[in-house]
Amino acid sequence: MYRIKNENLDFKIDSLGECKQNNPLIDFYASEGSSHFVNEKNKIKFSVYRNEDKGDRYEDVLLEKAGPREKIYFVPRHVKAAITTCGGLCPGFNDVIRSIVRTLWKIYGVRNIYGVKFGYQGLLPESNSPFINLNPDVVDDINKFGGTILGSSRGGIKPVEIVDTLERMNINMIFNIGGDGTQKGSLLIAEEIEKRNLKIAVVGIPKTVDNDFMFVQKSFGFETAVEQAVAAVAGAHFEANSAYNGIGLVKVMGRDSGFIAAHTALSSNDVNFCLIPELDFDIEGPNGFLVHLERRLLEKESLEEIPHAVILIAEGAGQKYFDHFPKKKDDSGNLLYEDIGLYIKDKITEYFKAKNIQFTLKYIDPSYIIRSSPANASDSLYCARLGSNAVHAAMAGKTKMLISLWSTKFVHIPIKMAVIDRNKVNPNGSFWRDVLSSTGQPISMKN
């Protein structure tokens, strides 16, 4: 759900300078008898939607197509590339690292590729972690494992000190794999580089298991997360459907956006209540969640079925119930949310005990299992494409940008646009309508 005015859409990509070097792929394509280079004039339309009555207000908004350029900025043998992985874990971290390394090494002939340990922290002077020399052998099978071989951390965004390190190590391109905070850090690093008139390309690969980046059709790891969450919901459903008034409560990731919860609900078809941050709801009261939960159980019993219910809640839902709590932030500056899952669990318990209604409640929080999982086949393929396109962009001197999938095409997006806001589920859109149709929950649970 995008809320940015047309006049504020600026997708111009910064470049370090004129590209004069021949791309090593020229020889490969020559042997193939064809050329697959991207022309700088090749653009992707921002919007494929058109209202014949009103016209297309995004008609002139175009995105730069990703892919290899015939002329590149850097001389491959002079390249020293660095890779960071930052923030929370996400399925596909290792797949992206592998793709970047293999593309640099096998396509461009780059031999100086460094893995930075523990995110931005590893670029600070006080870091005791030396860079890791990366090559195709080192990353050969890392895609089979969850987590990141480089380690990760939050915070550490000190642009001056980080650029000091990049300059001292003669790094001339850096790939930052991370979420909103990481990419905001990338932008600060790129701006410090610009101040010093250094020729260092800063390219981001957007990582958010919540799928909440602006102008990114799909974040890597998201499909794996939904797949794992569906398995957790299935377990909750089996538990709930095996007990009288059985209730399965599952909490999944989704701080500000409920994409994982919504996609999981629609994928599983076992969810009866899906609670997301985008929609306010009341727990108690005549039209509150608890009343509707009780009604669901009674209706099932009247149909001579096993009365049961499955509730799926995103971690950022219902945070209004903690407004009186002191606010805390993590090292990346993100607001730390209270556990709405446990809160709802306690409220359900209080409600049914007060009414002397027999029930069984199972609470499942698969968050850390989900985010530490290896990428599934679809995400692994996607990560490979993201990594290779990130390398093509950096070699062409593109900077202050990240790789995105948009209208099924890989494109370049300025980092400043990707972090301008959060992508959210549209509660008035067709997708959420389908979720409501699947769960059968009321359109509103507000008193």
Curated annotation (Swiss-Prot):
Q: Where is the active site?
A: D210 (proton acceptor)
Extract one GO molecular function annotation from the record: metal ion binding
Binding-site residues, Mg(2+) = D180
Q: In which pathway does it act?
A: Carbohydrate degradation; glycolysis; D-glyceraldehyde 3-phosphate and glycerone phosphate from D-glucose: step 3/4
Broad class of enzyme this protein falls into? transferase
Positions that bind substrate: T208, V209, D210, M253, G254, R255, E315, Y368, I369, I370, R371
As for subcellular location, the record says: Cytoplasm
Its needed co-factors are: Mg(2+)
Q: Does the keyword Transmembrane apply?
A: no
- Principal subcellular localisation of the protein: cytoplasm
Catalytic activity of the protein: beta-D-fructose 6-phosphate + ATP = beta-D-fructose 1,6-bisphosphate + ADP + H(+)
The cross-references to InterPro entries, in alphabetical order and at most eight, read: ATP_PFK, PFKA, Phosphofructokinase_dom, PKF_sf, PyroP-dep_PFK_TP0108
Gene Ontology cellular component annotations, sorted alphabetically: cytosol
Keywords, ordered alphabetically? ATP-binding, Cytoplasm, Glycolysis, Kinase, Magnesium, Metal-binding, Nucleotide-binding, Transferase
The keyword Magnesium belongs to this UniProt entry's keyword annotation: yes
Q: Which residues bind ATP?
A: G88, R154, G155, G179, D180, G181, T182
Q: EC number(s) on record? A: 2.7.1.11
Query: Transmembrane residues, as ranges?
Result: none
- Which family does the similarity line name? Belongs to the phosphofructokinase type A (PFKA) family. PPi-dependent PFK group II subfamily. Atypical ATP-dependent clade 'X' sub-subfamily.
Function statement: Catalyzes the phosphorylation of D-fructose 6-phosphate to fructose 1,6-bisphosphate by ATP, the first committing step of glycolysis.
**What's the protein name?**
ATP-dependent 6-phosphofructokinase
